Amino acid sequence: MDRKRIAAALLAAALLASCGRTAPDDRGQPEVAQPVPEAAPPPAPRPAVERIVRSAPVATSAPPPVARDGPAAPSSSANYALVRVFYGTNRSPLSVPGPEGRFGTLPGPLSYGEVVVSVPKVHQLGVIERPGMITGLFFSPDPRKHFTLREIRGLSRAQLLQAVAAQAERAGGPGQRLALVFVHGFNVGFDDAAFRTAQMSYDIGFKGAPLFYSWPSHQNVLSYLADGQRIDQSRPLIKRFLSEVIVGSRADRVIIVAHSMGTRGTVAALAELSQEHPEQTARIAALILAAPDIQARNFRDRIAPRLRRMAVATTLYASSEDVALQASYQVNGAYALGDTRAGISRFEGMDSIDATRAGTSFLGHSAYGESPALLRDIGSIVAGTPPARRPWLRRGADGAWVLEVVR
C-alpha cells in the first residue's frame, strides 16, 4: 500500500495540467488547436447539433433551472450556439448551488436532467474555451468567448427518456435515431463532463441526443486510489442508466464513449448487461474506449470474451506517451489497456488504434477530445465508417491501426 500511495503522489504530479481540465483562454485568447488537413470531409456538418430555443423548454415538474455562468435567460445569439445535453449522475446535489456547480463530489442516488451549454462562435476545434486566472483570481466567463453552463434542469426518469427520444427523432428521423453516451474519467467534475460532451457533439456534428454519465470523482489529482473505489461503487448505477437509455430512448443506434478510469465502470456494466439482457446490448452500435485505465490482463481475461459475444464494434485508442497511464502503471504494477509501451492490445472484434502520433497534446490525458485528428476519427466511427475507409489510418507492423497526423 505504501508503494501505491507514493505512486499515486507521482500520478498527481504528472496530472497537474490534464485529466478533464478545460482549456483557459487567458482572458480571451484561446489555446488554438492546430487544424489537421482533411483527407476526407467530416462526417456531418455542425448545424446538425440541436440548438435550444427558450420559448420551447422541456416540460417538467422538477425544480426550475439553475442559471450559472451567465444571464438567467439565454437566447439565440450571433455570438454563440446553445447545445442541449442530457445527463445521469450519482453525485449528491449541493444544498446551495455555487460556483463549483449544482453537484458535489459525494455519492448520491441516481438522478437525471438536462443542461444547456453555450458554445462561442469563435470556438476552435477540440478546445473548451474557459476563462483564465491570474494570481488565484478567476475571470468571469463570457459566452461570446467561452463555454458556459447556461441552464441545468432536473428531470424525472420518464421526462429524460421522453426528451431524449424526441431529440433523437428530430435529429435523425425513423431508422436514424442516434444517442451518444459519454462516461468521463478520473479527476473530472460534473460541469467539465457537460462541457466535454457538448464540445465533442458540436465538433463532430452529431445528429442525435448527446448524454453523459457523471460519477462522483473527488476532482483531485491526489485521489486516484479513492476515485478507483468510486467508479467501482458506481458500476450498478452506470449499468442501470445505460439500460434505461438503450431501451427508453428508442434510439436505433447507441454509441458509448468511455474515457480513462470511466472505462472500468462502463465495460463492467456492459459485460453484466450482455448476460442479463443481450437484446439490449445488441442495440449498441459502437463502443469507444479512449485511453482506458483498465489493467490489460484483466480486460483480456474477463471483459474481452463478453464483448465478443455482444458483437459490438469496439474501438481502442491507446498511446505510449499518455502520462497518466504511465503513472497508473506505477500505482497498479501492471500496464493499462490504453498504454502501448509493452505493445498495443489486440482482440477479436476490437479495432486497436495507436494514437501516439495524434500530436504533443496527446500527452494531456483528455486529448481524445482535444485532438482534431482524434475528433475526426471519432466522428467517422459515429457515422459507421470502417477503419479501412478512413484514409488517416494505416496498418502498423503489429497489425494494429496507426492514427496519422498530416502537418
Question: Across the structure, where does each feature detected by a protein language model lie?
Answer:
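Gly/Ala-rich beta-loop-alpha elbow adjacent to hydrolase catalytic centers
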Residues: 238, 258-262, 266, 271
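The conserved beta1-alpha1 loop
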Residues: 181-185, 259, 291
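Short, low-complexity, disordered segments immediately C-terminal to signal peptides
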Residues: 24-37
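Short substrate-entry loop that stabilizes the transition state in hydrolases
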Residues: 188-193
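Alpha/beta-hydrolase fold active-site loops
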Residues: 178
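Lipolytic serine-hydrolase domain surface
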Residues: 45-168, 173-174, 194-253, 270-286, ...
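Bacterial signal peptide processing site
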Residues: 19-23
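Sec-dependent bacterial lipoprotein signal peptides
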Residues: 1-17
